[in-house]
């Protein structure tokens, strides 16, 4: 049985049916949404995206996109089309604070893409994120130090518990025991890589990874 026709509330005439576009075309249109809105509308995975596209109420928001903002941003910074970070760098950089950027990264970026961004990033996107966020630069430097120290790991989620302005990542990293110090550090930073919590103590021009 066909669903009843929708009628105008004023004149009560039957409203025309919406055209049924192919799912591929609708998906292409929706792909131009800002990423956070795109995920809200159609979901993050291919399976949830297909289910969402089959729901008529989801199609009514296809016009709420900004055609070129993220693409122009990516083109300006020479981010490769094959870079897994390309769809997310613009929104990460637009975040108004470090906690918002980390929340977006942890909740919105798919796990596979997040692992690539943290552990094997392309130079252009990594450079942009490092320039924008000290917490990103600190995390990347910490991961390199961990790999060089034989503690290689491939996290997909990160949280840095520190004031963005206090984070320094250009200083040399070295391992140290908390019992080696007899003075208060300049800053103490806790970095959560997936479920592993790492303490970093900053003294002058050095960053000590507490082991």
UniProtKB/Swiss-Prot annotation:
Protein name (record): Late expression factor 7
Transcription found in the keyword field: yes
Record key words, sorted: Transcription, Transcription regulation
Function as written in the Swiss-Prot or TrEMBL entry: Involved in late/very late gene activation.
